[in-house]
């Protein structure tokens, strides 16, 4: 999931000098143009919401929604406490538009002492699972496994070549003709990155830290599109985990992925 670019710089010039006419002329140095920075650096703390009722019941939860469990609320509060302990002072905050995201960002911001409210953006919501929404999670994953040529979901997850993007694209194919919208991994990555780009570009006028609460597969798809190393993300993005993204001069750097240290610090 990484790419390398080979940049070759070559410069060639030919100077013709007429000894009779230009012997007395001196060369004038031309200073290279300095590219002006496009703005101040922005650090986005991209976070998954706390555990929900549908999470606890192992039901499929994309565009469907449910409130946080007691554990989910506690994780959101611990996240905020850990961020506050780290001295992070947020300039702005955003969340997806559903109850679980709003509860998480609100509880975390209360702990941080942020004045104001987060901005809701539907582009940050979870991938849509179409006809599988609200259904049994194991049933959906078994269907995906069979679609990809496996006998059952166990074989799918045990395959070292397992790729989440491929699995999500299979889920979208299984929804064809259902009349319900299901998204591919590329579609969810595109909308999430469009939202993050807009947030970062707006904040880059003065720079600073921004808290963004989204959902697990949306975060995973966005990180994959940014070329992040996801080899250590074995069981998906954890509830309350932070992935730190730095936006500078129109380019992204992924600093951390699936980091639970803030939740852990806030639980002490």
Which residues does each PLM region occupy?
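Phosphate-coordination/substrate-recognition cap region in phosphate-metabolizing enzymes
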Residues: 28-34, 38, 81-162, 227, ...
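Short glycine/proline- and acidic residue-enriched helix-loop micro-motifs
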Residues: 148-187
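His/acidic metal-ligating clusters that form di-metal
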Residues: 193, 202-204, 208-217
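Alpha-helix capping/helix-boundary segments
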Residues: 100, 218-219
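Beta-strand elements within well-structured catalytic alpha/beta cores of enzymes
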Residues: 42-48, 94, 208-215
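Bacterial N-terminal signal peptides that target proteins for export
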Residues: 1-13
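Acidic, low-complexity terminal tails and accessory targeting/binding regions
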Residues: 10-13, 23-41, 127-138, 201-209, ...
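Loop-to-helix element that buttresses phosphate recognition and phosphoryl-transfer chemistry
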Residues: 51-102, 183-192
